[in-house]
Amino acid sequence: TALAAVPAEKAVPVKQAAVVTEAPVVQPDLGPRRSVAFIGSECYPFVKTGGLGDVMYALPKALAKLNLDVKVILPRYKCIPQKFQEKMEYRGSFYMNLCSDGKQYYVGIMEYQEDGVVYDFIDNDEFFSWGNPYTNLIDDIPKFCYFAKASLAALNYLDWTPDVVHCHDWQAA
């Protein structure tokens, strides 16, 4: 069918649509990028015996998504699955004293990155070559004293000074 022409006197004027311009979104000035170091004895998927492993996995990932500079420091246990061990990269090593007896202890640093999070593993066969992260208090106390001190020394060695150092549980404190 053909459309009939409408006489000009009966035509309804069409209003032009208003042009809407959106105000530009102004991002708040958040200042410099913040950095957080998480130090703990376990973290999924590398090693997990309880809830600490879940927290050490989820919290750093969530903060990395918010654009924080995040680093997780863990012991390099021999029980960490090989698929992670073979992807770790050597970052360096040094020696430190643990107490006033003058004995120097090796501190190796191996790095693994995933989902915007840097995982630095403290390597020392004397303390971390056992099958389980936790053995008994007689062995665990010196092992985790070493780990806590080596973790802080590793931050210095890597020349990275975080805004926050979050130590999880007694093993890192």
Regions found by a protein language model. Give the residues of each.
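Catalytic cores of nucleotide-sugar-dependent glycosyltransferases that transfer UDP/GDP/TDP-activated
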Residues: 1-173
